[in-house]
């Protein structure tokens, strides 16, 4: 089979959709997780973070609880036109009529397990993002805080800034790898292999040349049953993240894993189940890379996933 003529140029990961039977139950979690409601229709609720994206998360009323796909912004409208003509099961370009920020979109199904993807262009960004305070710290040999000042915090959800990444379990790792990395400007930041030396997990970033980007905006691993693993949202700093952890704990939500520090990507992580069993992550302090950084390889063992934190749950990669 011949490959595509060229790669579709993705600019950033934009937003994600989840479908729920009980929209108000999904909304309750969204507010406790730190999203801000932007608008709603009869069957959708849109949420933003405190960044400039018009929305980063959307829940949709549906007969079943299921993943609704992730959207990436493309470089220009020509990329949308090319995508609509070359990607499998792709739609024509259509208007995002009820979505905050508007814009145009192409939706397609990837050929391995049929996950939905959305490519968008022309969304109007918010005029400005809300600035949160950058704290100063008193280290043993360097005291940054002014004299007679205090660190005081408010108990509240951890406000979301942006969608950082998402991930799948795919049933054919190599086929998925070949499709994504030949059709889009993804570059593997880290690849892991199993005990037989077979590749089984990849963390991929967008190749934007010299521009610094997150260590990964997309990851996937090999498994017997295809499913979305989690969507991850950046919050402000570690105190904010820890306050959000306590907020969710006191609200009775189930923690999957965290708080801890990843090795690949370096993020401080905190994974939670919503009421319908989908996994959402708060993260802070992730690595930034550009095209000059080469792919790293490692064995897929539990100790490569984190350097500190609670023990790795048995069901984390199920």
Question: Which residue ranges define each predicted feature?
Answer:
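A structural feature that tracks compact, well-ordered secondary-structure segments
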Residues: 16-18, 29, 38, 48, ...
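N-terminal beta-strand motif that seeds the catalytic metal site of vicinal oxygen chelate
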Residues: 1-24, 69-70, 131-174, 187, ...
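An N-terminus-focused feature that recognizes amino-terminal "leader" regions
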Residues: 1-107, 121
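Vicinal oxygen chelate
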Residues: 2-6, 12-21, 61-86, 88-159, 162-171, 202-205, 252-318, ...
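Structured core of small recognition/catalytic domains
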Residues: 173-260, 267, 274-276
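Short acidic/glycine-enriched loop/turn segments that link adjacent beta-strands
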Residues: 43-44, 66, 100-104, 196-198, ...
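Core segments of cupin and vicinal oxygen chelate
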Residues: 8-54, 111, 168-213
């Amino acid at each position: 089979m011949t490959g595509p003529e060229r790669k579709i140029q993705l600019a950033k990961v934009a937003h994600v959709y989840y479908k729920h039977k009980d929209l108000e139950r999904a909304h309750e979690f969204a507010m406790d997780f730190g999203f801000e409601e932007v608008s709603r229709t009869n069957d959708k609720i849109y949420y933003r973070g405190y960044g400039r994206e018009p929305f980063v998360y959307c829940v949709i009323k549906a007969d079943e609880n299921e993943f609704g796909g992730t959207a990436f912004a493309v470089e220009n409208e020509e990329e949308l036109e090319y995508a609509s003509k070359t990607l499998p099961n792709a739609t024509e370009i259509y208007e995002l009529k009820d979505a905050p920020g508007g814009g145009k979109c192409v939706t397609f199904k990837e050929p391995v397990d049929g996950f939905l993807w959305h490519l968008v262009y022309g969304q109007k960004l918010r005029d400005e993002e809300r600035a949160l305070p950058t704290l100063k710290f008193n280290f043993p040999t360097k005291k940054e805080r002014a004299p007679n000042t205090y660190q005081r915090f408010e108990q509240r959800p951890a406000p979301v800034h942006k969608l950082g990444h998402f991930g799948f379990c795919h049933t054919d790792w190599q086929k998925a790898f070949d499709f994504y990395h030949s059709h889009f400007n993804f570059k593997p930041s880290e690849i892991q292999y199993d005990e037989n030396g077979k590749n089984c997990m990849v963390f991929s970033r967008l190749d934007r040349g010299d521009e610094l980007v997150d260590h990964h905006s997309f990851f996937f691993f090999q498994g017997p049953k295809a499913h979305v693993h989690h969507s991850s949202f950046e919050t402000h700093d570690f105190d904010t993240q820890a306050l959000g952890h306590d907020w969710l704990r006191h609200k009775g939500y189930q923690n999957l894993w965290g708080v801890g520090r990843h090795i690949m990507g370096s993020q401080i992580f905190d994974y939670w189940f919503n009421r319908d069993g989908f996994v959402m992550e708060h993260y802070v302090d992730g690595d930034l890379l550009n095209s000059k950084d080469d792919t790293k390889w490692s064995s897929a063992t539990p100790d490569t996933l984190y350097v500190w934190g609670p023990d790795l749950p048995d069901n984390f990669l199920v």
